[in-house]
Design a protein with these regions (language model features):
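N-terminal leader/capping segments at the start of a protein or of a new domain
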Residues: 1-28
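Beta-strand residues in well-ordered beta-sheet regions across diverse protein folds
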Residues: 37-39, 104, 118
Length: 156
C-alpha cells in the first residue's frame, strides 16, 4: 500500500468516534494484511470481581472485526472507498487480556462477492512474552460493483 492510502486509512480510524474512543491505531497496512492496536485503558476493562482489570471481550471482538475489514479493504481497487459488511464473526478467547492489544488480520480469500480472514490478537503476558489472547475469523460480503455507494443508493 502506498503512503497516501495508509494515511487515508489512519484518518478513517481517527475520524470514527468509536474506533478513536478505543484508542485504535493502524500499525501496518499492506496487501492482504492489516495490523491494528488498542492500548490498555481502564475504561475498557471488566468491573466484575474475578475479571477486574481484564479487557472486556467486546473490545477484542471489535478488534477482530475491524482488523478483518481493513485487511479486506486492501483487495479493493480503492481501499479508501470499499463497500463491505460483516456476515459472520467468530471469536475464541484463549486467555485474559491485561495489556495493550495487537491484532494481525490476514486475508484467506477475497473473491468477487465474499471475503474471509483469519485474525490473532496478541497481548503481553506477565513474563513479558507476546501471546495470543484471541483467535478469530470473519466472513464479509464484498460489494465490488458498488464500492463507495451506500446501501440506500439502491440498485443501478
Amino acid at each position: 500500500m502506498d503512503d497516501a492510502v495508509a494515511a487515508g486509512t489512519r484518518e478513517v480510524i481517527e475520524n470514527h468516534d468509536f474506533m478513536s474512543w478505543l484508542g485504535m491505531e493502524l500499525v501496518e497496512f499492506e496487501e492482504g494484511r492489516a495490523v491494528l492496536s488498542i492500548p490498555h485503558d481502564e475504561k475498557l476493562t471488566n468491573i466484575v470481581e474475578g475479571s477486574r482489570g481484564t479487557i472486556h471481550g467486546g473490545v477484542t471482538a471489535t478488534l477482530v472485526d475491524t482488523a478483518s475489514g481493513f485487511a479486506l479493504r486492501t483487495t479493493f481497487d480503492d481501499p479508501l472507498e470499499p463497500a463491505l459488511t460483516t456476515t459472520d464473526l467468530d471469536v475464541t478467547y484463549l486467555r485474559p487480556a491485561r495489556s495493550d492489544l495487537r491484532a494481525v488480520a490476514e486475508v484467506v480469500r477475497a473473491g468477487g462477492s465474499m471475503g474471509y480472514t483469519d485474525v490473532k490478537v496478541y497481548g503481553t503476558a506477565p513474563d513479558g512474552e507476546q501471546k495470543a489472547v484471541v483467535k478469530g475469523s470473519a466472513s464479509y460480503r464484498l460489494f465490488r460493483d458498488r464500492a463507495g455507494r451506500s446501501e440506500t443508493d439502491g440498485d443501478r
